[in-house]
């Protein structure tokens, strides 16, 4: 299985790796690991659709039997028995389908959560220092849960309903070859309409997940930094910021609802139902079909209602799940330039520190430190004084490679810290920080 690999600051041995080249490939690689549960769900879906088709066919036969000159009560009873048996079997198949997809959904959620957690352990301290905690928590909890919902009820209902689309295609021609026309045209138009619906829904669901992440990020920061907020009398400003983020999330959710309200397949189904019934009645008037066959054919067309109605919810859930998977992958695949450097320098540390023309900046912002040079001898005590935001903490974090210098070199015992084994470097450095909080 092809995977995306990267350097890590910390690694945990894993026996299983997954394809991270895209959200669909990634989700599929997780599903493939649980193929027995997927096969169980698909088998249950096929059996459920087959048993659902039995009822209209038997009802049509019962109608012809009742309308005959000498109806047989015994035959009617046998039809009733077969209907009852088929629906009991259908219930069993539904249970197998639901159990299989719920099983795979829970296992995939477990594996995704574990994969994300191990990946976050391997991220550098630079990453965790700059990445908002609230956004990480939103991806690690709610987005992972959306991947669960992608399988159940998402794929559970989609795969279960797709079989209902094809049952009329196979059963209708047995009454008359021309009767395949209506369900065939409906299926083709349904696929086109559904494709356009999903394409238009993708950016909306991405915005829903992104807005939720931003809302969660700001809320987490406000709660963690509540002392700072109250100390600066910024309660009203924080309420305003939270209100704007909540409004953004609300607008995205409303837009998703508006797009779902314009779901075209519901209209196409009702048109197909009317056209199909009219076609069957024309054949009945011509003596080609009998009353029981008309009833059976109309019952087969009614099977199209399930995939049409359920896809309104199910495909939205799949789109949300893929949006969540996309956000999780973006977090896991984010570049990490800091490596453990297992083969690096790791002698006993003496404690000499030297900064040579060191400059550092956060992302695309201006330099936090610029062309800084000084030396500290072993045993020497140095006090660094400056106002908040002047770069004091940043300077100390360059020594243990929480950050790497943008320009210049930081040396410990005469060697660039990049040449040191990371564990050996940090094991010999102690840092005690004051209780501070800076908003992102």
Give residue spans per PLM region:
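Membrane-integrated ABC transporters
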Residues: 1-53, 67-79, 97-101, 105, ...
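Juxtamembrane loop-to-helix connectors within ABC transporter transmembrane domains
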Residues: 23, 31-34, 97, 101, ...
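Transmembrane helix-loop-helix hairpins at lipid-water interfaces of multipass membrane proteins
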Residues: 38-93, 173-178, 287-291
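A hydrophobic transmembrane-helix motif
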Residues: 54-61, 89, 155-198, 254-296, ...
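Loop segments that connect adjacent transmembrane helices in multi-pass transporters
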Residues: 114, 119, 129-134, 207-255, ...
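Cytosolic ends of transmembrane helices, especially the final helix of ABC transmembrane type-1 domains
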Residues: 211, 231-234, 267, 304-331
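ABC-type nucleotide-binding domain
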Residues: 340, 348-440
